[in-house]
Amino acid sequence: MDYQIVIILLISGFVVGFINTLSAGATVISMTVYMALGLPIIEASGTNRIAVVLQNITSSLTFRKQNLLDIRSAIRYAVPIIIGTLIGAQFSMMVSNRVFNSIFAVGLVLMGVLLFIKPQVWLKGTGTSIKKMSVSHFILLVVAGIYGGSVYVGVGYFFIAVFVIGMGYDLIRANALKGFMAFATTPFSLVIYMMYGQVNYTFGLIHAVGNIVGAYFAATYASRIGTKFIRYLLLTLIIVSLIIVIVKEF
């Protein structure tokens, strides 16, 4: 493998791990890089999950050490997401690259809308006490799991919205929960992608090294870093990814 590709995968991995630990949506960077390096979109989605698992193991352990992650609650929340993840991953194996491209594009647009609609309103928490998981929360997490099991890009925003708006968590603890959800549920979809040969292990493992380092630094300094610059960066990358999808299709 050319050393330039290794450098690109490591640097982009660091950025993805850093941003995803603080916020969400940086998986668009991974998908953009993988597609630019020639991977079909479904294989790019499968390959991405290697880094997702390893990155979120790192961030979850770091948040846990800082007493920002309630493992018991996190395990309960993971159940509906696992159900949705299995459905979404199996669905992605049944559709063509063209259909997956369309779903991916819709996900990108939706993520862009979420970034524009006053994110500071729902990223700061509701200021209320933590609520127990209701039936509506369960259903929303299943739906988020379906999206995560297939497209994945931007799924963290849906997790954060449920945890912050629906349950009353503050942003840092919601991010800690979001990371644990990814760590606990992504292996289920990864196995399905592996069974269908839709994973590039070399790209995925190299990218994961950068993810791990980025996640560690972000989780360690989470309370000191702002998210304004990150949102602008993600909007730029959403546009780039949409262009790549359109070019591949037409």
Language-model segment annotations:
Residues 42-46, 175, 179:
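Small-residue hotspots at the loop-to-helix junctions and early N-terminal turns
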Residues 1-40, 125-175, 205:
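Selected transmembrane alpha-helices and immediately adjacent juxtamembrane segments
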Residues 46-99, 186-236:
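Selective hydrophobic functional segments
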Residues 143-153, 189-197, 204, 241-250:
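Hydrophobic alpha-helical transmembrane segments in multi-pass integral membrane proteins
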Residues 6, 49, 104-108, 112, ...:
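Residues within membrane-spanning alpha-helices of integral membrane proteins
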Residues 36-37, 43, 65, 89, ...:
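Transmembrane helix-loop junction
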Residues 58-66, 105-130, 240-250:
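Transmembrane helix exit motif
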